[in-house]
Structure formats: structure tokens, C-alpha cells
Curated annotation (Swiss-Prot):
Disruption phenotype: Knockout mutant significantly impairs plaque and syncytia formation and decreases virus production. Its main location: host cell. This is Envelope glycoprotein J. Residues 71-92 are cytoplasmic.
Amino acid sequence: MDRYAVRTWGIVGILGCAAVGAAPTGPASDTTNATARLPTHPPLIRSGGFAVPLIVGGLCLMILGMACLLEVLRRLGRELARCCPHAGQFAP
């Protein structure tokens, strides 16, 4: 993967994790309004709703973002080692 693709997928992964983490969990998450906790319609999918796909998608995006960040750090380390070969050596 080239540098542009690594950066792009890293940003997509980070933004996707932020979006999944910021998503409201439903009417029960609103504690300011007592009537908001009442069910207004039946659940869309009775076997867990959209929570499982959101969690799995968020984990996949998080793994993708971490992999891209590790790739960026690996490439940065190689460039620093090539430019400054004596920077990591300590004098006794």
C-alpha cells in the first residue's frame, strides 16, 4: 500500500470508530425526558437490533485504523533510521 492509501484508510478507521462510539444507544440513553424511555415502536430486528452489526463494524474499523497507524509508524522509523543512522546509538 502506498502512503496515501495508508493515510486515507487510517483516517477512515479513526472517523468510523468515533462515529460508532458517538452513536446514541436509543431512547433509554436520554435521561432528561421521562417520556423518551417509553417504547414508541416495536424493535426492527428482535434478535438484538442493530447493536451487533454496529459493534462488529466498529471493531473492524478500529483494527483497520490501528493497522494503518502501525504502518505509518513503521515507515517513519525506517525513514528516521535511513536519515539519522547514529541517532539511536548511545555513547558509553
